[in-house]
Structures are given as C-alpha cells and as structure tokens.
Amino acid sequence: MAAYRAFMIDVGRHYFSVPYLKKLIDVFAMHNINYFHWHLTEDQGWRLEIKKYPMLTQIGSKRKETILPTKKKEIDGVPVSGYYTQDEAREIVKYAADRYITVIPEVDMPGYMLDALASYLELCCTGGPYEVATRFGVFEDVLCAG
C-alpha cells in the first residue's frame, strides 16, 4: 500500500483560483503526494457553493478587510472574496484524481463558523450580530446544537 502523503490548502482564509489550485496539484503530483486536504471554510470565509444555502457564498465568502496577523492592529483595507461553484469543485476533484490525488474536503464545525453565522443568524444561539472575521484567532461563537 502506498504511503499517505498529503498537502493542505487553506482557502477559507485566503481564496486561490481554480487555475492556481491546478498548478499546485501538478507540483504535488510530481512529488507523489496522494491526498489533498481542501480546507474550504473558516471564520474568514466560506468557499464552497451550497445551492440550498446561497447566503453562505453571497455573504460568507466575503470579508471587508484583514487585520494583519504580524501587526495585530494594522488593517490592510483590502476586501477578500471568492468561492468555488459546485462545478468548479467537481473539476478540481477530477483534475486531482487524474493525477492520483484524493481530495478530502474540510468544513469546520461547530466552531470556526463566523462566515456561516454572518450568513444565517438562525444558526447561532447568542443572537449575533456577526460578520465574517477580519482577524485570525479563536472565537467563542459556534453553531447552535439545538
């Protein structure tokens, strides 16, 4: 059996285009990497189209700016957005599979969900309001379990 050799791309915090992901997949395939952990959600952005929940991409895929992690209080003022349609996600999965790489999609829950809470307030227990996170770290707000 082949060894488990994986790479992870965190598109939740920083969106990467489909062509860029394909280039990365090509590079990792050349190194016999066989698993791709595709980190699709994070407090800072929801990156996968879910047709039943369109606000996840209409609201959750966009943040107004980013507080720079190395400077704590400095804001870059640069909006960040982007998500993958279901067709694009299928395209990436097939592209990787053609190179013997298995894609493992990752969706955080119940924590790291400010993107979803900003999109659907009814998912929270505390009433909000919420916005897609502009800083990095750990937040207390999680999905309501009941």
Q: Where would I find each of the regions flagged by the language model?
A:
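Feature activates predominantly on carbohydrate-active enzymes
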Residues: 1-140, 146
